[in-house]
Amino acid sequence: DQHPRIVIHDCHSIRSVVPRLFEGTLPQFNIGTNDGRACDPVLTTGIERICAGSGFSHVANGRFKGGYITRSLGDPAHGRHAVQMELSCRGYIAEAVGPVDSSNWPPPFDPQFAAPLQQVLRRVLEHCIEFITR
């Protein structure tokens, strides 16, 4: 009752290409809402709009529709809005293409390389805050 609405933003990263899991290359932003069942469409639409305007690739409810946290905690009817955001590593690090070994993984963190994606994440989180405080 103290917080009539909350947003659970479950964000983590994955290699952009993982042949044993999927073909091709993942978009940089993979948004999962359990096919819209885990959060209000207004929240999802805003996040998608931010990602679409960022210049980074994105998809909603593609390969990653939302894991356990999104599916079990997202309950918009009771004010709990859950969004999974799976980030492809190439969006924030100079990810090696092809086989990985100790010479190319993990790549060093470069704040300048990561800055554009960080700004998009900041806007996504600001949208989440605006959504729960409106």
List each language-model region with its residue ranges.
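Catalytic cores of processing enzymes, dominated by hydrolases/peptidases
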Residues: D1-E95
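His/Asp/Glu-rich mid-to-C-terminal helical/loop segments that flank catalytic regions of hydrolases
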Residues: V97-R134
